Amino acid sequence: MPAIRRHTPEPLRWADSSDVRIRVGFGFGGAARPDDHDAFGHLVDDLERLGFDSLWVSERAGSATLDPMVAMAYAAGRTERLKFGPAVMVLPGRNPVLCAKALASLDRISNGRALPAFGLGIADTAEQQAFGVQRSERAAWFDEALPLIRRLWTGDVVDHDGERFRLDGVRILPRPVQDPFEVWLGGQAPSELRRCGRLGDGWLPSFTTPAAVADGIRLVSETAAAHGRSIDPEHFGALVPFVHAALPERFAQRLRDRQPDLDPAEVVAHGIRGLRSRLEELVSVGASKFVAFPLDEPSDWHATVEDVATELLPLQT
């Protein structure tokens, strides 16, 4: 990887208020995957040592990336400060009681460092088959499961008789340390944005443009208001993919298939300096929580994390 010239970036200015906290995390998955004890352990150690806010692990049942729940538990036991979340955890197909129990336990043993984030899952037949839910059924499953998980996190006895789940006197203990245990949602389709406004506490899209983030923040906020809710202005972020060299054609084609009218360069930053520029654009439209996400496998994970830290961590407020 080309050497990065060291410098101290100028502080970013928030679009509406200088009091909003900018935070930078680091994520991995797909083709970029430290997937053994040494590689993943050293990555976790670097993130903790350098002062990253959080670690994020993608969920792909059919890929070689680590299972996010296992990876987060490992990180919890290896660190004292670093937060961690799935980017994002597929909810349709999961037993909501077991999911609530696992995440509450993770938050408990980490002393309140878990960051629950859920989504419908990617539009991939093999992935959908792995979770056992038809694409047409995912939204209804999600809409019943998430409120049920929230009720279970209260520690109260829960009775529920729904279309997919029935519970008679189920109680989850221990409760999460965080109260409330806030949930971030992924996705960027209008239906997903409205769901975030109805059910979520924060929004974390990926592979998106600053303009789309600005539009999404408006729709999420408007939907929340229409349902008598509000989303904390600090709870809008983005997972920001980047590459060290040219974007591999296989990724470019996937992006073109997903959004034919979009230039892949608009959603994938080129180099660490390009990554910083993309964060500046996102901050200007109201986002403040970011996950730097390498799309290609770094030749040296340690050097990559060091370079991202040098370029981005001074921007945290």
Give the positions of each predicted feature.
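N-terminal beta1-alpha1-beta2 module of alpha/beta enzyme domains
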Residues: M1-T79, F181, L295-P298
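Short, acidic/polar
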Residues: P34-L47, A102, L185-R195, V268-L282
